[in-house]
A protein has these predicted regions:
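Amphipathic alpha-helical interaction surfaces in cytosolic regulatory modules
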Residues: 23-103
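STAS-typified acidic loop motif
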Residues: 4-34
Length: 105
């Protein structure tokens, strides 16, 4: 059995929070991409999309690409895209790649 990813989606007013648990990689990134598309295609879309990655322990470049694609799509629909919480490994990944200032609060 390969890595798993669970996503809990909570809509509260005009804000949506995705809480992710597991790993984001080549095998699981399509699941995240699909969920981001569903959330951002809502009418009206949320004004703020918050991702909680506190329980994500691994992310490869595929996962990074999905986050950047989601951020770009969010900007297209006037939605603020933020990663609110990260695990230490993901915080380090964001620091190394320069995404910390772009994606986190």
């Amino acid at each position: 059995m390969g890595p798993e990813l669970t996503i809990q989606t909570v809509h509260a007013g005009d804000e949506t929070t995705l809480t992710l648990v597991g790993e984001i990689d080549l095998l699981t990134s399509t699941q995240l991409n699909r969920e981001l598309e569903i959330v951002l295609d809502r009418v009206p879309p949320p004004t703020r999309l918050c991702l909680d990655l506190a329980d994500v322990m691994f992310m490869d470049t595929t996962g990074v690409a999905v986050l950047l694609k989601g951020r770009r799509r969010a900007l297209e629909v006037d939605c603020r895209f933020v990663v609110s919480t990260t695990s230490p490994p993901i915080a380090r990944l964001f620091e190394i790649t320069g995404l910390a200032g772009l994606l986190t609060e």
